[in-house]
Amino acid sequence: MIKIYAPASIGNVGVGFDILGAAIIPINGSLLGDFVTVKLSNKFNLVNKGIFSNKLPKNTEQNIVWKCWLKFCNTIKRNIPVSIILEKNMPIGSGLGSSACSIVATLVAMNEFCDKPLNSKELLLLMGEVEGEISGSIHYDNVAPCYLGGLQLILEDSKIISQTIPNFKNWFWIVAWPGTKVPTAEARDILPKKYKKETCIKNSRYLAGFIHASYSQQPHLAARLMQDFIAEPYRIKLLPNYLYVKEKIKKIGAISSGISGSGPTIFSISDNINTAQKISAWLTENYLQNTTGFVHICFLDSKGVRKIG
């Protein structure tokens, strides 16, 4: 038996649309992500458990886990009869890499179960392919940090897919999911097909500056440069009151904030735990729309996916 945990992640991290992603873990030590258990069986079987298992498709062949299993078997050219348990603890369409959690956990679990026929690069490529089939385009800004941990710079080069970027150890990342859903495909469709040259240059300048500030450990400069000129101006239509919320948490003391992935989760950053707790309390009171929503104060998760049992 193999049991794997895969953490939630923040896609884009503001300034890096489809280029940056960060794995997160609550500071209280709890695990925010999905679990996948693989056992030997005489045929494929899938059991869905967890808080959000009722949101998964009833048809097994529409489940991400089945798609991962099939693609893995096709890749290694072997039919592996297994029983898989998915503990779906991440809300679907939340902007926290929910699909990436299931994809990464399943593919790593299958690879471990089969004595690692695929290397890490081959696995990551497979993860990106499955993510692309679900969201409409291959992108690694959730699967890479979920798999590798930390803050990842997505290069998508033929030899190097992703590189780890230094982060700031004293940053608290507050993530707030309101309890609603924004499908990734819908959030991508709302974006323009073309951008002005000036916009592209400005975004490139800020992204380059953020990478430089991360390596030179200038937290205030990095926070100031975490601005999204590519997706946020258009996706705010999908997030009612987003600009109001962003302004309020800035007044409380957030040094940066933005939309996590496609939303509706938002993230904010503080370098002070007391301020982080105040932001968390305000978001809990004002951003959550139902009882399933949540707010977590997190660190970046440097471990990424890991074996639990």
From Swiss-Prot:
The keyword Transferase applies. The keyword Membrane does not apply. Gene3D superfamilies: 3.30.230.10, GHMP kinase, C-terminal domain. SUPFAM superfamilies: GHMP Kinase, C-terminal domain (SSF55060), Ribosomal protein S5 domain 2-like (SSF54211). It is found in: Cytoplasm. Disulfide bonds: none annotated. It catalyses: L-homoserine + ATP = O-phospho-L-homoserine + ADP + H(+). Its main location: cytoplasm. It comes from the Bacteria. Pathway: Amino-acid biosynthesis; L-threonine biosynthesis; L-threonine from L-aspartate: step 4/5. Its EC number is 2.7.1.39. Keywords: Amino-acid biosynthesis, ATP-binding, Cytoplasm, Kinase, Nucleotide-binding, Threonine biosynthesis, Transferase. Catalyzes the ATP-dependent phosphorylation of L-homoserine to L-homoserine phosphate. This is Homoserine kinase. It comes from Buchnera aphidicola subsp. Acyrthosiphon pisum (strain Tuc7). The lineage of its organism: Bacteria, Pseudomonadati, Pseudomonadota, Gammaproteobacteria, Enterobacterales.
